[in-house]
Swiss-Prot record:
UniProt keyword terms in alphabetical order: DNA-directed RNA polymerase, Early protein, Host cytoplasm, Transcription, Viral transcription, Virion
Cellular component terms per the entry's GO annotation: DNA-directed RNA polymerase complex; host cell cytoplasm; virion component
Name this polypeptide is given: DNA-directed RNA polymerase RPB7 homolog
Family: Belongs to the Asfivirus DNA-directed RNA polymerase RPB7 homolog family.
Swiss-Prot/TrEMBL domain comment: Contains an extended C-terminus, with no homology to characterized proteins.
Cited function: Component of the DNA-directed RNA polymerase (RNAP) that catalyzes the transcription in the cytoplasm of viral DNA into RNA using the four ribonucleoside triphosphates as substrates.
Subunit (UniProt): Part of the viral DNA-directed RNA polymerase that consists of 8 polII-like subunits (RPB1, RPB2, RPB3, RPB5, RPB6, RPB7, RPB9, RPB10), a capping enzyme and a termination factor.
GO biological process: viral transcription
Regions that span the bilayer: none
Organism expressing this protein natively: African swine fever virus (isolate Tick/Malawi/Lil 20-1/1983) (ASFV)
């Protein structure tokens, strides 16, 4: 995910006299030279956006070098990969009995290790582009490196889901804090609306948990879901509309929330019910309304970006056909 972050650091200054002739210009240049295009504090820095605070230039008195140093707080545009993130385009650069390596074509530079011990991963050939889900706690940002490293597997639709039990109402202030994530979703939806609808249908159907036919899709624009798959007696809730109502104190977040497999994962939909009747063996996760909505919104963002990236990457029929072995693998894993 692209984000803004604030960092603190101490810069060593080789020529304090020259540096202080134009501190702002020299400081920005120094920050760019050291950090842009490199890993730093669990992020990959794309651009320095500003200096927030700086100390005077201090002279080192422990030696006779004449060098100086300065404490700096700065903001930067960064890319951050997290556990379980989806990457739509990972190009396989090595595949042998010991290891499978891939490089992301869409995110910041990252090398992804794909375990060859998992048989599903061995279908990918060198040069092919595969969709990957990162493993848990698998992203490593080593300071100063020009790329991150991670572990992941070819992404297969998931059958499991979590149920969240919310026992306190979402406040207006909390709903306001969620508008940043809502805005990202709306931006991704706008981008999606400009893509080829046939491509969207292909990948939505491919990554739907159940096996379905094209004519079973009712309306992917609002993600009602395939015929016969809707949960009985339940009507899905549009999370975005719900949060806009929450800003006006016109909605209640109490109860049990979930996004089970009958919903398209890139949809802004979820189910809410008073009593837990979701078909899962896992116990409900008790959490605040804010934590639950952050979790749901980030999942929606992840899947929406994933679907948009798939459409952008596999943008012609020939490229899609060259990867039929990957699509067949995904279809075989469905319920």
């Amino acid at each position: 995910m692209i984000d803004q972050k604030i960092f603190e650091t101490t810069l060593n200054i080789d020529d304090p006299a020259n540096f202080c002739t134009n501190v702002e210009a020299h400081l920005l240049k120094e920050l760019e030279n050291i950090y842009v295009g490199k890993c730093f504090k669990n992020s990959f820095i794309l651009n320095i956006t500003g200096v927030i605070q700086r100390s005077p230039c201090f002279i080192m008195r422990t030696n006779n070098s004449g060098r100086g140093y300065m404490h700096v707080r700065f903001s930067a545009l960064v890319s951050c990969l997290n556990a379980f993130d989806l990457i739509a385009a990972v190009k396989i650069i090595k595949n042998d009995s010991n290891i499978i390596l891939g490089e992301s074509l869409l995110t910041e530079p990252v090398t992804i290790v794909i375990p060859s011990s998992e048989s599903q991963n061995n279908v990918a050939e060198v040069g092919q582009i595969v969709p990957v889900q990162l493993a848990n706690s698998s992203v490593y940002y080593i300071p100063g490196r020009q790329q991150a490293s991670a572990t992941g597997s070819i992404f297969i639709p998931k059958h499991t889901f979590s149920v969240y039990h919310v026992q306190e109402e979402l406040t207006q202030e909390q709903a306001l804090n969620l508008t940043k994530l809502v805005n990202i979703i709306e931006m991704l939806l706008e981008s999606r609306s400009k893509k080829d609808f046939k491509q969207i249908c292909f990948f939505e159907k491919l990554y739907y948990t159940y096996s379905i036919n094209s004519d079973e899709i009712l309306d992917l624009k609002i993600w009602k879901g395939p015929k016969g798959k809707e949960m009985a007696r339940l009507k899905p809730c549009n999370v975005l509309s719900f949060l806009y109502d929450a800003l006006k104190n016109k909605s209640s977040s109490l109860g049990f929330w979930a996004r089970p497999p009958d919903l398209f994962k890139s949809s802004p939909l979820a189910y809410q019910q008073d009593q837990n009747s979701f078909n899962t063996t896992e116990l409900p996760i008790i959490c605040s309304a804010e934590v639950m909505f952050v979790t749901l919104l980030k999942e929606i963002i992840n899947y929406l970006q994933f679907m948009n990236d798939l459409c952008d990457t596999f943008n012609n029929e020939q490229l899609i056909k060259r990867h039929e072995n990957i699509w067949m693998l995904i279809e075989q894993k469905k319920i």
